[in-house]
Amino acid sequence: MAKKKSEDHSGGDANDSDYNEEPNFEDPPNFVDNISDDDLLGDMLAQRPSEADGVESVVVVDNIPKVEPVRLEKLKSVINKLFSHCGDIVNVVYPVDEEGKTKGYAFMEYKHAGQAEEAVKKLNNHRLDKNHTFAVNLFTDFQKYENIPEKWEPPTVQSFKVQNDLYNFINDPDAYDQYCVAAETSQNCVQVGFWQNVLPEPNELETRERFTDTFVKWSPLGTYVVTFHKPGVAIWGGSSFQKIQKFPHTGTQFVEFSPCENYLVTYGPTPTGQKIIIWDIRTGAEKRSFVADGMSVLSMFRWSHDDKYVARMGDNSIHIYETPSFYLLDLKSIKIPGIRGFSWSPTDNVIAYWVEEQNQIPARVTLMEIPKKRETRNKNLFHVADCKLHWQKSGDYLCVKVDRYSKLKKDKKELDVKFLGMFYNFEIFHMREKEVPVDSVEIRELILAFAWEPIGNKFSIIHGEPNSANVSFYEVNKGVKPSLVKRLEKKSCTHLFWSPRGQFIVMANLTMGTFEFVDSTNDYIISASPDHFRASEVEWDPTGRYVVTGVSSWKVKEDTGFNMYTFQGRIIKRTILKNFVQFLWRPRPPTLLSEDKQKDIKKNLKKYYPAFEQKDRLRLTRASKELLEKRSQLRETFMEYRNKRIGEWKEQKSRRVMLRGHVDTDNLETEEVDEEVVEFLVKEEITLLE
């Protein structure tokens, strides 16, 4: 519907012509446009079709073998098998020369561009064999490489940034240890405090709000602490715990550090299973990634003690990768039919693994040297249901806990297997002796826990009924069978925690929250038996001087917190902390002193006692003085507040007298006061008696 023209514009031809004239958008004469099309229409030009459209899903694979036509089909099957893991392949072209021989490269088209990018990410630098390593690039990258300027321009000099001292925590002259305490302030929001265990009261170093979404974890040598977030994980370090590196891996649930802190492994869920990524900690670069079937695959990688190798178990094989290339050792896996478990020695490049029984062939435990792949010891085992491998921390001994059965019962389809008449063997391998002799200890009761003394030659076992178990201590010596040195009967413990320095052990019941502290060199006397109701964790400090028990809000929601004890079980500190979730001592790197120097210090330790005792007295005196000064300051603050309020009370006296009928009640004596009793009816009830 046309709009009626207003009367203001209906009076003359001049007005009509001005009203109907269209506006002029032309540039004035001599106008210079200083705005480029990219600035004005950058978002639209970014969507402009280009010559490369349609080839984003094509990759170029270089350095493939040059083969004759008779071997081409075999080459195609090998390459298709590798590249089909990244997506659906639409077309493959292998250029050939006049004789029909391949030219050493191929063009591969995927269904989607994202699949092509995944192929470049996973298979670039993939080593096919000794002489061929793939170079995989997107077809669209050629344009990028063509536009490289011919004239080299030197990079701009970046200003030097002072790096954090990552090892300042071990420079404390009194060698006080550090620990962190985590408490959940809200959902997916955890506050973490860092403390130094100074006597007589710990010193707070740093507190971070919203530091992590779930929990934290120290690296093996205490250099870094890792935090978890939705986009990935980050590591922090230095005196003020600054961010050192971040690793983007969405939904990371678990991480592992290599023993020397060179690499980090992150585990995160995918729609089909778990994705595992190995990162270089110093550069933040992704070294290799894996996809595992199933959502509960955690800690599937095992590192050698020196970070030279990392291994994982496959179907009837062990895959050992060399660092830093992360290629398979000798470019192939180690085939071991029936393998069920393996573990690295904590001090040597030796792998221990066990194989299940197959077709009347007994189970077997094998020691293998790496990288030679030479088997140094085999031990056959019969009637085996399961095995667990336990290395002593110093690598001197290996204990294999063998679950054995007297009778095997199978159903008709052999899908359900029941083991009857269970008993247990402990096979002790003497790793430092010639030909690795093996001793055996048999126990006919249910095994609840096993633990090696970290430094020493003893191990302990909890066996029997859970509510009335026995704790046995065995000693291992050269040339003789392991001997039972002590048995503590009728103990209600479920876990064993040795001191990192040996000698002392905590027998814990993490169901009831009871603990017993035992000295293994003093006839296994129980020095203390404290309780910490609902405690769910026990943490020794790295020096073996203190023990912490904690009640985490992951287990219960009330009375959460932690207790700190001496190695003899004497309580030092009780801390109640709402929504407490985690307590972790900061690990220490190994000492730089030689064994001879350590022995010399232990031998002459008595001459250091006077200096230590004097320092302790000074510290306690200083602490007492600081405590008295603090109390005096609090008293002065209180008296100042009290006098201020008394002054206000006196200033209000005239108003009080007026409000109280001009009677000064401030100075009334009790004898001048008359008591008046007033009674009134509150409630009346009538009860009929028969």
Swiss-Prot record:
Record-linked PROSITE patterns? RRM
Q: Which UniProt keywords apply?
A: Coiled coil, Cytoplasm, Initiation factor, Protein biosynthesis, Repeat, RNA-binding, WD repeat
Q: Carries keyword RNA-binding?
A: yes
Q: Could you give one GO CC term from the UniProt record?
A: eukaryotic 48S preinitiation complex
Q: Name one GO molecular function term.
A: RNA binding
Domain of life of the native organism? Eukaryota
The RRM domain covers which part of the protein? Answer: 57-141
WD repeat coordinates:
207-246, 247-289, 293-331, 334-369, 442-484, 530-575
| Renumbered residue ranges of the record's region Disordered | 1-37
The family database entries (SMART domains) matched by this protein are listed as: RRM (SM00360)
**Where located?**
Cytoplasm
List the biased-composition ranges (Basic and acidic residues). Answer: 1-11
| Compositional bias per record (Acidic residues), positions renumbered to this chain | 15-25
Q: Name one GO biological process term.
A: regulation of translational initiation
The protein's matches in Pfam families, at most eight in alphabetical order, are given as: eIF2A (PF08662), RRM_1 (PF00076)
In this entry, which stretches build a coiled coil?
Answer: 614-645
Role description: RNA-binding component of the eukaryotic translation initiation factor 3 (eIF-3) complex, which is involved in protein synthesis of a specialized repertoire of mRNAs and, together with other initiation factors, stimulates binding of mRNA and methionyl-tRNAi to the 40S ribosome. The eIF-3 complex specifically targets and initiates translation of a subset of mRNAs involved in cell proliferation.
Stored PANTHER family: EUKARYOTIC TRANSLATION INITIATION FACTOR 3 EIF3 -RELATED (PTHR14068), EUKARYOTIC TRANSLATION INITIATION FACTOR 3 SUBUNIT B (PTHR14068:SF0)
Q: Subunit info?
A: Component of the eukaryotic translation initiation factor 3 (eIF-3) complex. The eIF-3 complex interacts with pix. Interacts with mxt.
As for family, the record states: Belongs to the eIF-3 subunit B family.
- What is the protein named? Eukaryotic translation initiation factor 3 subunit B
Tell me what gene encodes this.
eIF3b
